[in-house]
Amino acid sequence: GIRGIHFLDSGNYHYVTGIMTEQIKQGFSLILFDHHTDMQKPMIEHMTSCGDWAGKVLKTNPWLQQLILIGPQERDIQQIYSEKEGLVTSTELREKLVTFSAEEIQSGEAGNKISKIKKNFPVYISIDKDILDEEYSETNWSQGKMSLPVLERLLMPFLKSGNILGIDICGECQQGMPLPQYLEAEEINGETNKELFDFLMHYSHM
């Protein structure tokens, strides 16, 4: 089942979250922490990739009540709303999606949107560690600048809701790296994984 904390390997496999959420048969919110929106227009209509899976969940999952996207840059978020290129053009989808850009989190403006979060649904939490600064995580994609303590602070209100359906974490490093860098990256990621796992176990009561 989806209950518990699942590690999904590198961000290439983030589309597995879409498969996990297909198992949910009740109204729920997806809380997505990611440096990327994962809502590009699909290159091939019936194939799901790490770049478009979240957009497909938003458009097609009948049980999804809200998708809360935390961490991409403002310019990437604007792109998903653009009339020409964007995925989220209908009013229905716009109402389902709440976004908090890296810039809004840094400036404190994110607080203005908190009232938009629906609190009466269970949540599934998905974390891509590419949201973190390289001090905390070494991934195979471009990364954000968030610290681990800030990520934990942002997770806390969702964990305290006490109604967690499941949690997944991706963002491991690329295996084709030269060995010294790979070992160093594995060490950084291992420490962050342990810290995140302990934190999530403690506060989510999974």
Regions flagged by a language model, labelled:
Residues 45-48:
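Glycine- and acidic-residue-enriched helix-capping/strand-helix junction motifs
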Residues 1-8, 12-29, 52, 62, ...:
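Catalytic cores of soluble, metal-dependent hydrolases
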Residues 30-42, 53:
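Long, hydrophobic, well-ordered secondary-structure blocks that form the structural core
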